[in-house]
């Protein structure tokens, strides 16, 4: 049976941390930010951890 290929689109969007969790960037930050407050923009600039529910499906795509 051949090896599973890594989904490159996902691999470019997430990073795997040392404990195995996946880290991603938040959306709604790239443009049209004038209507957002400074607090919103600051919080959107930080990375976040992918939930455990989604992690199971996404780890299979990164194999």
Curated annotation (Swiss-Prot):
Ranges for region Disordered: 24-44
Key words of the record: Ribonucleoprotein, Ribosomal protein
TM stretches of this protein: none
Cellular component per GO, a single term: cytosolic large ribosomal subunit
A single GO molecular function term of this UniProt record: structural constituent of ribosome
Biological process according to GO: translation
Domain of life: Bacteria
Family of this protein: Belongs to the bacterial ribosomal protein bL35 family.
HAMAP family in alphabetical order: Ribosomal_bL35
Full protein name: Large ribosomal subunit protein bL35
């Amino acid at each position: 049976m051949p090896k599973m290929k890594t989904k490159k689109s996902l691999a470019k969007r997430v990073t795997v941390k040392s404990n195995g969790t996946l880290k991603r960037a938040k959306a709604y930050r790239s443009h049209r930010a004038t209507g957002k407050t400074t607090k919103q923009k600051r919080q959107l600039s930080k990375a976040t951890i992918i939930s455990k529910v989604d992690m199971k499906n996404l780890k299979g795509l990164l194999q």
